[in-house]
UniProtKB/Swiss-Prot annotation:
It catalyses: 5-amino-1-(5-phospho-D-ribosyl)imidazole-4-carboxylate + L-aspartate + ATP = (2S)-2-[5-amino-1-(5-phospho-beta-D-ribosyl)imidazole-4-carboxamido]succinate + ADP + phosphate + 2 H(+). The gene is purC. It is an enzyme of class 6 (ligase). Belongs to the SAICAR synthetase family. Pfam families: SAICAR_synt (PF01259). SUPFAM superfamilies: SAICAR synthase-like (SSF56104). This is Phosphoribosylaminoimidazole-succinocarboxamide synthase.
Length: 301
């Protein structure tokens, strides 16, 4: 018989996830259907989103472990007997790590906050770039562009590699940069074979009791990555995406009536935007993994 969620101590709530303690060395990592944008948790939820994030992370944790020797925090299978029935398919048993205070961001293309930095300074996170780059320009080599980990409701801030050295030391910073770029390159190469460009992505790493750096949190999900369709990619324009950029675009468009820079929270998402977002997340998972989402464990919303 599986335990109930109430059997575990609730430790923390994030924008999307809930964290529980299983025992002295293991945590239960639960992905909800909440969606955030521009540092706000939206009133609307995306049905099955938590299951998609979990399924995608499980696929990539396994793929990266096999193909790039990237170790991770998983401490059991998706149907681990310690996972309560009510969160099966959207929860994982993970090893408790000492998390690094840095968002490990890898960028293969110029967009988002990187584009804003470049337009203002000609650099991204202190890295000088050639002139003449535009929206969606591809870099010759992926960039490691770290950011601070902001508190809930605050903005992540891009920082330089020297800032990372100041936070975690030179040796660990170099290891983090190398691991981030290796992980991104391997995962992005796989996605490209499935017709998807991973423009950028955000990883989180922690250190285990033996001092080993491990990939944690989520990996290559539509929440943590920008997914573009490879078949209609064109430099200099906003790309068609499979990720939550679709929601961001609606929020900042004329139909929402919301001022991103005002003091009001975002409005609820219309049903058609909710449905389209769910469909995009599922399509991203199925295209990249080659698996059917209907076969993933847990009860569909």
């Amino acid at each position: 018989m599986r335990p109930a969620l109430t059997d575990y101590q609730h430790l923390a709530s994030g924008k999307v996830r809930e964290l529980y303690r299983i025992d002295g060395g293991h945590l239960l990592f639960v992905a909800t259907d909440r969606i955030s944008a521009y540092d706000h948790i939206l009133k609307s939820e995306i049905p099955d989103k938590g299951r998609v994030l979990t399924a995608m992370s499980v696929f990539f944790f396994d793929y990266l472990s096999r193909t790039a020797a990237v170790s991770n925090h998983l401490a059991g299978p998706p149907d681990d007997e310690r996972i309560p029935e009510e969160v099966l398919g959207r929860a994982l048993v993970v090893e408790q790590l000492e998390m690094l205070p840095v968002e490990a961001v890898a960028r293969g293309y110029l967009t988002g906050s990187g584009l804003i930095d470049y337009q203002q300074t000609g650099t991204v996170c202190g890295i000088a770039l050639p002139s003449g780059l535009v929206e969606a320009s591809r870099f010759d080599e992926p960039l490691f562009t770290p950011a601070t980990k902001a508190e809930l409701g605050e903005h992540d801030v891009n920082i330089s590699f020297d800032d990372v050295v100041g936070l975690i030391g030179a040796e660990r910073a170099e290891e983090l940069r190398d691991r981030t770029l290796r992980t991104y390159s391997q995962g992005a190469a796989h996605a490209l074979t499935r017709g998807i460009i991973v423009a950028d992505t955000k990883f989180e790493f922690g250190v285990d009791a033996r001092g080993e750096l491990k990939l944690a949190d989520e990996v290559f999900t539509p929440d943590s990555s920008r997914y573009w369709r490879a078949d209609d990619y064109a430099e200099g324009q906003v790309q068609n995406s499979f990720d939550k950029q679709f929601v961001r675009n609606w929020l900042t468009g004329p139909d929402s009536g919301w001022d991103r820079h005002g003091d009001q929270p975002p409005p609820p998402l219309p049903p058609d935007i909710v449905d389209a977002t769910r469909a995009r997340y599922i399509e991203a998972y199925e295209r990249i993994s080659g698996l059917r989402f209907d076969d993933w464990i847990g009860v569909s919303a």
